């Protein structure tokens, strides 16, 4: 699972989802990519499941880049615990994604293979995504 090596604070506030993605909106490394259409949290387990799905489909062909990192801790209180008594312990890590964010990039494979691999990975996520290809920027 992906998680930060160390953080300044163990617990974080929920934060806001408003607006579009501020960075990583273009295909910079590969030829094809998966781009978000919705906002939400992507957990480190979902990222790992997507990575495994892409790699299993491509079978050592091509190269894969993961463009998101789960750097936000999500806390959870134990089951059957009364309210109050402070915030719960850190439970898992998530990456905050907004519309337009590139999640995964693929290179050195055909368009059909890239589409199939990224479609299989998109099924592991709880947000809508689309397939995009690289466009030359000036």
Swiss-Prot record:
This is Large ribosomal subunit protein uL16. Part of the 50S ribosomal subunit. The keyword tRNA-binding applies. HAMAP family: Ribosomal_uL16. GO terms for molecular function: rRNA binding; structural constituent of ribosome; tRNA binding. The gene is rplP. NCBIfam families: rplP_bact. It comes from the Bacteria. Binds 23S rRNA and is also seen to make contacts with the A and possibly P site tRNAs. Keywords: Ribonucleoprotein, Ribosomal protein, RNA-binding, rRNA-binding, tRNA-binding. One of its GO terms (biological process) is translation. The keyword Ribosomal protein applies. PANTHER family: 50S/60S RIBOSOMAL PROTEIN L16, LARGE RIBOSOMAL SUBUNIT PROTEIN UL16M. Belongs to the universal ribosomal protein uL16 family. GO terms for cellular component: cytosolic large ribosomal subunit. SUPFAM superfamilies: Ribosomal protein L16p/L10e (SSF54686). InterPro entries: Ribosomal_uL16, Ribosomal_uL16_bact-type, Ribosomal_uL16_CS, Ribosomal_uL16_dom, Ribosomal_uL16_sf.
């Amino acid at each position: 699972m992906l998680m930060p090596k160390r953080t300044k604070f163990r617990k974080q506030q929920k934060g806001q989802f408003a607006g579009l993605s501020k960075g990583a909106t273009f295909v910079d490394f590969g030829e094809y990519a998966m781009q978000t259409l919705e906002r939400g949290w992507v957990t480190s387990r979902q990222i790992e499941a997507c990575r495994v799905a892409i790699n299993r489909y491509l079978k050592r062909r091509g190269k894969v880049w993961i463009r998101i990192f789960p750097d936000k801790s999500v806390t959870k209180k134990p089951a059957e615990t009364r309210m109050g008594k402070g915030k719960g312990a850190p439970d898992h890590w998530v990456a905050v994604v907004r519309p337009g964010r590139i999640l995964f990039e693929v290179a050195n494979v055909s368009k059909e293979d890239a589409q199939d691999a990224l479609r299989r990975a998109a099924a592991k996520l709880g947000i809508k995504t689309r397939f995009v290809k690289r466009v030359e920027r000036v």
